[in-house]
């Protein structure tokens, strides 16, 4: 199969969705499929290092608004022509924003089916980034509309699908879980000692671990509040691996409560800060990208703590399970899917009292935690090869459904004219590029003029067509002019 994978981010940015696309591309390529990845362009990035083709397209620097991400231009005609000439059998977008627009345009150009995977609660991301209520609402509508326009929608968990439906999506959803790139097994004692060197980690004190972005909406203040409630009853070490904009506010809360803490700072040295509370300490390692070091921390810890109701899949929970580490999760959260309380993990209510009650118990029953970790390893772990194998099978079903005409919409969407126009522009561009011009002085200048003329005409037609479409689409288009 020829498979076009699209996402609004790619290395040098690393997050859960980027990791998904990297693993899809790697496994599919290893299985003999022809893979192309389309993604916004980041300056000074070499995309030729991958064993598959990467087509990068123009982007805007929105890192101040989005925490390091760039926004891809949703109608990059030249780059879409390159993707269309790839002649994909499947178009699979992992983001409904710029990648969603491109997927729809490619679908109209090539006739191949388009799939969207719903990875995260985009409505929360939108509200965190866009503080104007009207603009945020319109952005969410556009995202859901792009999802509705795809031939199939997949979700990484049942909870992720429920989130999409709560935003107004009315179609069918196929649950397609993500995998983890940890093999089953623990790190060696030598690797653990190397990874944890310099930190205050007594052998007889329980170690709790969190890995991820240090953001308050991940439920991290709840953990600190819970540990405060048991500070006079149990000793512990709470390790935070990662970085995030709320790191400093978490440290302020820890200081306010009188706890000691340690931080690996930018100088790569571990700095210790004492506190009047005699028991308990918090440790901030900073971000860790080396997978062997993350495995070592997952092996050293007694329990993984993940009090997030934001995450739709909780890959870090499965990574912990790969190392035989069980997790404490919020009951009925997406990350808690597949967890049986007290068997292969632990479920609490979303409040500090419930967390404190369980953590007090956990500090005194670490061997029980270890047994739950073994069961988690055997029951909730799924490798990327297993996950992508499920997707490969589903790709075949999607192609058969498309051939049978099962994805033909009974009613056109209000913005279909826009995508018909974009598809026409892609055809025009590909036609012009396929011509063999005569060789004469100034030829390259003339080709550049022709290229610029085509791109300019697309922009002009976007402006004209927006005047004839409903107000909702016009408002969306104004943000791309």
Residue ranges and their predicted role:
Residues 278, 368-382, 386:
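A short, well-ordered alpha-helix in the C-terminal region of glycosyltransferases
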Residues 309:
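Aromatic "clamp/platform" in nucleotide-sugar-dependent glycosyltransferases that forms part
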Residues 326-330:
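Short hydrophobic beta-strand element within catalytic cores of glycosyltransferases
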Residues 1-46, 53, 385, 420-481:
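N-terminal subdomain of nucleotide-sugar transferases
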Residues 147, 287-288, 295-301:
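Short alpha-helical donor nucleotide-sugar binding micro-motif in glycosyltransferases
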Residues 19, 206-229, 234, 238, ...:
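A conserved mid-protein helix/loop that constitutes part of the nucleotide-sugar donor-binding site
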Residues 251-288:
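Nucleotide-activated donor-binding/catalytic signature segment of Leloir-type glycosyltransferases, i.e.
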Residues 341-342, 346-352, 361-366:
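Conserved acidic donor-binding segment of nucleotide-sugar-dependent glycosyltransferases
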């Amino acid at each position: 199969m020829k498979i076009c994978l699209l996402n609004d981010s790619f290395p040098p940015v690393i997050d859960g969705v980027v990791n998904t696309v990297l693993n899809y591309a790697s496994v599919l390529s290893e299985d003999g499929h022809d893979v192309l990845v389309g993604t916004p362009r980041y300056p000074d990035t070499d995309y030729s290092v991958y064993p598959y083709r990467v087509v990068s397209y123009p982007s805007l620097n929105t890192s101040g608004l989005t925490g390091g991400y760039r926004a891809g231009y949703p109608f990059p005609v030249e780059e879409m022509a390159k993707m269309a000439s790839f002649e994909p059998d499947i178009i699979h977008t992992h983001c409904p924003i710029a990648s969603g627009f491109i997927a729809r345009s490619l679908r109209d150009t090539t006739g191949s089916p388009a799939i969207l995977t719903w990875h995260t609660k985009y409505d929360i991301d939108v509200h965190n980034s866009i503080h104007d209520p009207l603009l945020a609402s319109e952005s969410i509508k556009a995202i859901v509309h792009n999802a509705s326009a795809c031939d199939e929608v997949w979700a990484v968990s049942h909870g992720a699908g429920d989130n999409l439906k709560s935003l107004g999506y009315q179609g069918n959803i196929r649950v397609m879980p993500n995998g983890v790139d940890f093999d089953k097994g623990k790190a060696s004692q030598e690797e653990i000692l190397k990874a944890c060197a310099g930190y205050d980690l007594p052998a007889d004190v329980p170690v709790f671990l969190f890995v991820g972005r240090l953001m308050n909406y991940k439920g991290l203040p709840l953990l600190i509040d819970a540990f405060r409630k048991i500070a006079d009853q149990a000793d512990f070490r709470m390790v935070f691996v990662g970085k995030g904009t709320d790191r400093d506010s978490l440290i302020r809360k820890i200081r306010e409560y009188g706890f000691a803490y340690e931080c690996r700072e930018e100088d790569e040295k571990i700095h210790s800060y004492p506190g009047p509370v005699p028991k308990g300490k918090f440790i901030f390692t900073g971000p860790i990208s080396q997978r062997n070091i993350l495995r070592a921390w997952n092996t050293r810890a007694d329990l993984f703590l993940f009090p997030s109701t934001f995450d739709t899949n909780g890959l870090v929970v499965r990574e912990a399970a790969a190392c035989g580490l069980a997790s404490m999760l919020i009951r009925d959260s997406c990350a808690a899917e597949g967890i049986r309380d007290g068997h292969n993990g632990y479920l609490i209510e979303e409040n500090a009292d419930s967390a404190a009650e369980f953590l007090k118990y956990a500090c005194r029953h670490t061997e029980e935690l270890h047994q739950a970790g073994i069961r988690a390893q055997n029951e909730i772990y799924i490798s990327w090869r297993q996950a992508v194998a499920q997707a490969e099978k589903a790709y075949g079903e999607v192609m058969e459904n498309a051939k049978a005409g099962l994805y033909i919409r009974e009613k056109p969407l209000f913005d279909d004219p826009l995508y018909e126009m974009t598809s026409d522009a892609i055809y025009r561009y590909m036609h012009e590029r396929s011509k063999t011009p005569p060789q004469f002085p100034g030829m390259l200048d003339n080709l550049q003029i022709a290229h610029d003329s085509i791109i300019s005409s697309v922009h002009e037609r976007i402006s004209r067509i927006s005047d004839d479409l409903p107000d909702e689409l016009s408002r969306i288009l104004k943000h791309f002019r």
